Amino acid sequence: MGPRLQRGLQGLVSKEPLDPRTFRNVLGQFCTGITVITTMHDGAPVGFACQSFTALSLQPPLVLFCPTKVSRSWQAVEASGHFCVNVLHEKQKDVSARFGSKDTDKFAGIDWRLSKLGSPIIDGTLAHIDCSVHSVHDGGDHFVVFGAVHSLSDVPHKKPRPLLFYRGDYTGIEPDKTTPAQWRDDLEAFLTATTDDTWL
């Protein structure tokens, strides 16, 4: 780590403590999708709801998510070395609630199958991304986990709307936003920029 980066990181640390509630309220203004990260551990399926998932790199194809350091589900992912990202759609609030809870058997009543790497794919999700753990980095009270993408689900012909989380509650997008967006070439900074079969 070079001196400039070290100084930059030191400057990011607030000298005055931030109120946790205010911090969460402000960050809650940023709308996110909801995923379920899954793996297998000791022959049993393991999973947890996660809104910190995001795309990271196209070449090589990488994604990331940020589990808390005390997460037992993350420990299972770390032990297995692989995971599947299940992207939820708007009618899967119950799935999100189940995997965001402390239920001992989160997969009870959930239909699933194994991915090529051996992680659970939850039936009926908007998309799934099969990954191996690429690297793990420190992120305060969380870890930042980079995942190497091995395979992807097909994009459904009929696109259901995604399940979103905003200001501490579930939300969605307007019905007319599920139609494909017109092609545009001015979004090079967007890792998931629109193509002929995607939308903003």
Regions found by a protein language model. Give the residues of each.
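Basic, polyanion-binding surface patches
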Residues: 2-200
